[in-house]
Each structure stands twice: as C-alpha cells, then as structure tokens.
C-alpha cells in the first residue's frame, strides 16, 4: 500500500514522498481497494510485549489448493516484533503437529517466556471438563517453564495480532498462482516469510521497522528472564476459627 511504497522510496532511494500523495496517485489509477470502516484504534485495549520472545501467539487458518483440497496453515508470531517465527502448511493441524512445530521453532529462536493461543483442543484441554488432563503441548510448556495464556472464550481480539497476520498472509497468497500441492504451498509460505519479516515495513512498529529489525533490537525474554512476576490475587473466606491456609506451588 501507500505506506509500504513510501517506506521503500525513503529507505532504498532516499526519496521522501508523502503517503497521502502516493495514495492519491494509486487511487487515480484504480489501484486502491476500498476497505470497510473499522473501529478506531483508540477503542481497543492494546497489549504489546516489552521484549522479543516474551509472548508468542499461535493459531492456524484454512487454505485450499488448486484442486480444492483443504489445508491448514499453522502460524507462530512474536507479540513484541510481529516477527513470523514459523508458518507451516499441513493437511490437518493436530495436537502432535502443534508440539512438533513448537519444538522446531524453539530450536531456531529460543524458548519463549509465554505463549498465547485460543482454546482449541490442539492447544489446551482446559475447557474439556477436566477429562484427560493436559495435552502434549501443555505438558511441554510446563516442562520448559513456559507460561501458558489462553484467550477468553468469545473474545477473538485477544489473539488479534496472529489473526491480523492471517489476513496479511491470505491477501498475499491470493495474489500468487494457486498451489497444487502442500509442498508448493510451503514454498510460497517460505517466500512470504522472507518478504514479511525482512522487506516489509510494519506500521505498528516504531519507525515502521521490519519485524526482523524489531525482533533483533532487544534482548530476548525466556522462562528464566521474566519481565514481571505474574502475581495472582486470591480471595478466601476465613473459617469460624479464624484460620487461613497458605499454598505453595498449588499445595497447602
């Protein structure tokens, strides 16, 4: 769009052109797609992690191959930098898929301090009525000391960054020839990652930096390097004898 063109003109050619001027010329050429009126940004309560790897968001989205075969794309992004850590194509995303791709991602980028996902069964069993205990992904997070955060049901904006990433990804994919196989789709995703992380300025980042620049600009958080204590407030009733029970690590 106009912002991206202005960024490239400034950073690669030393030419300063107002975004409004670029928008006007694109609109005159019929190259601007009208978008629905959105809620003002000020109406949202925004959270942004202070450090890279302080919080990873994950989710998967749906895509169809040229022969209408259904596929699912699993995405991991860094909350602080919007850096796309991993984007992989699968016939179907399962709990085993999530665990495998998470392990590959931490091998490349380190262990995050926390993760944020929705309440899909591939990520958590917390809404399953206590049946079956933790799934493999939850057990892995506990083993690594990673704080797991799940969105409140019916509040999709909690995972808004990865949802917005899906929109950007699909817009790019729609402009490419439709892949005929999972392998072809993965090659397209790899090409998109290079473009998105390293060559595309992000409007939500300071100075419209690229996600790769923001991801490498500060030290990474990890389970042993926490930016807050995550203290929890608990309210209890005092019994008739005036006694209180204190808990440590969930035990009285």
Feature map (PLM): residue ranges:
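Basic, flexible linker segments flanking DNA-binding modules
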Residues: 1-58, 127-128, 132-138, 210-218
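Mobile-element integrase/transposase regions
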Residues: 15, 27-83, 91, 95-113, ...
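Conserved, non-catalytic sequence blocks in retroelement Pol enzymes and Pol-derived host proteins
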Residues: 14, 48-50, 66, 128-129, ...
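C-terminal, beta-rich DNA-binding module of retroviral/retroelements integrases
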Residues: 197-252
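RNase H-like two-metal-ion nuclease catalytic core shared by retroviral integrases
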Residues: 117-119, 127-171, 185, 190
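Short, charged, surface-exposed loops that flank catalytic or proteolytic processing sites
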Residues: 1, 59, 174-188
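Mobile genetic element proteins and their domesticated derivatives, centered on retroelements
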Residues: 5, 22, 59, 76, ...
């Amino acid at each position: 769009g106009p912002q991206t063109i202005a960024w490239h003109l400034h950073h690669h050619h030393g030419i300063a052109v107002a975004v409004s001027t670029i928008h006007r010329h694109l609109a005159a050429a019929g190259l601007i797609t009208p978008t629905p009126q959105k809620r003002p940004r000020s109406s949202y309560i925004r959270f942004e992690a202070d450090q890279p790897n302080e919080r990873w968001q994950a989710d998967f989205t749906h895509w169809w191959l040229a022969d209408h075969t259904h596929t699912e794309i699993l995405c991991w992004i860094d909350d602080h930098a919007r850096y796309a850590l991993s984007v992989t194509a699968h016939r179907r995303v399962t709990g085993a898929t999530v665990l495998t791709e998470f392990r590959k991602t931490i091998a490349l980028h380190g262990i995050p301090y926390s993760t944020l996902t929705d309440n899909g069964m591939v990520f958590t069993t917390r809404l399953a009525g206590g049946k079956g205990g933790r799934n493999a992904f939850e057990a892995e997070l506990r083993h690594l000391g990673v704080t797991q955060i799940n969105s409140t049901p019916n509040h999709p904006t909690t995972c808004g960054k990865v949802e917005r990433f899906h929109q950007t990804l699909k817009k790019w994919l729609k402009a490419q020839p439709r892949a005929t196989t999972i392998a072809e789709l993965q090659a397209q995703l790899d090409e998109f990652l290079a473009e998105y992380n390293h060559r595309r300025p992000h409007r939500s980042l300071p100075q419209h930096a690229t996600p790769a620049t923001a991801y490498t600009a500060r030290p990474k958080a990890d389970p042993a390097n926490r930016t807050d204590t995550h203290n929890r407030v608990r309210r209890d009733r005092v019994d008739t004898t005036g006694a209180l029970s204190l808990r440590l690590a969930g035990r009285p």
